[in-house]
């Protein structure tokens, strides 16, 4: 598999000023992204806490987004839900991801073989968001579904993504991770560096108890042939069922084969 033996560099850089960056637009998009899987209604106070913005700023943003159709105001609760314009964007994005349809049967094969959960994800800022999910019917799996978000720096899926992107993009992402938690950053950085070593050694990235102490996973990222953003596929589940040895020895070759089959299928289309 291409590029699986070259260890990506990991560097640190300071924050960058960008005169082309539109702060008001970024805040509006950040507010929309505060709605998580399972959220039905959120008020200005909840949104302000999640976005870490003043409530007055959030009030102006929700007013504008409601006028534009990206939020819908619920008069009974005084809160907001995502509007039809937002849902239309999501629908268009998912409809373009033909990889989901191609991946489903292959992901199910791996899930059944390993009695685990196999998920396909893409990056959204400092998270990976599940866009497809397949579970084994014969084993306990994690309670995550399409739309679930997991952190980029502590999960196998996120680390696999970091391993294949450009050095400049990786540096920018990790700088934002550092800004979120200066105290834990040295530990996070060391874990990411170790994950890049895993990528060079095994051709995949790992997270054995790093995200959650009772969860083990491996993952591999790849660039779709159609030029869209990189995607990651993980294979994971409860640590008592999926040992690191099993995942690396038994599941890893099948995960690598899955990605190769996806590439070949998409290139032939």
Question: How does the language model describe each region?
Answer:
Residues 2-11, 139-211:
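Short, solvent-exposed recognition segments
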Residues 2-101, 260-268:
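N-terminal helix-turn-helix
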Residues 38, 114, 124, 200, ...:
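Residues at helix C-cap/C′ positions in short coil/turn segments immediately following an alpha-helix
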Residues 71-73, 120-121, 222:
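A structural signal for short hydrophobic beta-strand segments in well-ordered beta-sheet cores
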Residues 76-176:
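Amphipathic alpha-helical effector-binding/dimerization core
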Residues 172, 178, 256-269:
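Cysteine/selenocysteine-centered motifs that mediate thiol-based redox chemistry or coordinate metal-sulfur cofactors
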Residues 185-261:
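Extended hydrophobic
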């Amino acid at each position: 598999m291409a590029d699986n033996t070259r260890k990506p560099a990991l560097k640190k850089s300071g924050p960058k000023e960008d005169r082309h960056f539109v702060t008001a637009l970024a805040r509006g998009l950040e507010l929309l992204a505060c709605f998580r899987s399972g959220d039905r209604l959120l008020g200005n106070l909840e949104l302000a806490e999640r976005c870490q913005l003043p409530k007055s700023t959030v009030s102006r943003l929700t007013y504008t987004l409601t006028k534009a159709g990206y939020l819908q105001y619920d008069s009974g609760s005084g809160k907001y839900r995502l509007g039809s314009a937002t849902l239309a964007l999501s629908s268009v994005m998912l409809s373009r991801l033909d990889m989901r349809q191609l991946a489903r049967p292959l992901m199910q094969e791996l899930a059944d073989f390993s009695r685990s959960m196999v998920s396909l994800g893409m990056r959204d800022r400092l998270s990976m968001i599940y866009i497809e999910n397949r579970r084994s019917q014969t084993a306990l799996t994690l309670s995550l579904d399409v739309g679930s978000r997991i952190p980029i720096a502590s999960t196998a899926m996120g680390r696999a993504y970091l391993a294949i992107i450009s050095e400049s993009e990786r540096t920018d992402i990790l700088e934002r991770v550092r800004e979120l938690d200066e105290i834990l950053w040295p530990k996070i950085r060391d874990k990411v560096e170790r994950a890049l070593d895993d990528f060079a050694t095994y051709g995949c990235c790992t997270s054995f108890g790093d995200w959650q102490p009772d969860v083990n996973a491996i993952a591999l990222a790849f660039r779709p042939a159609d030029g869209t953003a990189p995607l990651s596929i993980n294979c994971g589940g409860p640590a008592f069922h999926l040992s690191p040895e099993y995942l690396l020895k038994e599941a890893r070759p099948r995960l690598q084969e899955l990605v190769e089959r996806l590439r070949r299928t998409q290139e032939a289309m």
